[in-house]
UniProtKB/Swiss-Prot annotation:
Keywords: Coiled coil, mRNA processing, mRNA splicing, Nucleus, Spliceosome
Biased composition (Polar residues): 176-190
Region described as Disordered: 25-67, 85-117, 157-200
UniProt feature coiled coil, ranges: 1-37
Name used for this protein in its record: Pre-mRNA-splicing factor SYF2
Keyword Cell membrane in record: no
Gene name, Swiss-Prot/TrEMBL: SYF2
GO BP annotations, alphabetical order: mRNA splicing, via spliceosome
């Protein structure tokens, strides 16, 4: 086959594509007209099968879905894909380290709120600050007592959280390894194991 034959085939394919598009539009128009006609109240007999009405409903739903699908543009589809990717990304971030960062920030903010403000009010004259020549930012010296109290409170909170998590982990480990709920249950399980080994 030479180039002219391929060119002819391409023209035929393009023409068939256009014919199919026209046929699809006509079918959609017919379905829409039938649907409008179908909205009029109908008279049903008592002996009509419910299955027939279910089939009609499902065919109507399918035609509605088809017409809705033709109303979306490529740009709508691209936007929808981007939204789906953002949702997946946000789910992954919330499951991983973002949750811990959020917890750390909330803990820090709580500790700052818990610091007593009236004791450490500073007067404008006492405030010492410098302007950084490179960045142009203002550097203010923090009150050492406030910083130490904040660090002490954060350490206490972290220790409490660590102790509670360790206790929970130990409880889980103890019950899962031994398979017993309390000391009596543990003793009973050991006697059963001993009896079972003695029978062998």
């Amino acid at each position: 086959m030479n180039l002219e034959d391929y060119n002819e085939k391409l023209k035929l394919l393009k023409k068939s594509v256009q014919d199919i598009k026209i046929r699809n539009r006509n079918l959609l128009k017919q379905e829409a007209e039938e649907k409008e006609k179908g909205l009029k109240p109908r008279v049903y007999s008592m002996h009509d099968d419910e299955d027939d009405s279910d089939e009609k409903r499902s065919s109507d739903e399918q035609s509605d879905m088809r017409t809705n699908l033709f109303q979306y543009t490529v740009q709508d589809f691209i936007d929808w894909e981007k939204r789906q990717q953002r949702k997946k990304k946000s789910k992954l971030e919330s499951k991983s380290g973002m949750r811990l960062q959020h917890l750390a920030k909330n803990t820090y903010d709580k500790e700052l709120q818990n610091l007593p403000r009236p004791e450490f009010k500073m007067k404008a004259k006492e405030t010492q600050f410098r302007i950084n020549k490179d960045s142009g930012k203002v550097n203010i010296k923090d009150n050492k007592e406030l910083v130490q109290r904040l660090s002490q409170n954060l350490k206490e909170t972290a220790k409490q959280r660590y102790d509670s998590n360790r206790k929970i982990a130990n409880d889980k480990e103890h019950t899962s390894l031994s398979g017993s709920i309390n000391a009596k249950n543990l003793q009973f399980n050991k006697s059963l194991d001993d009896d079972h080994e003695a029978e062998k």
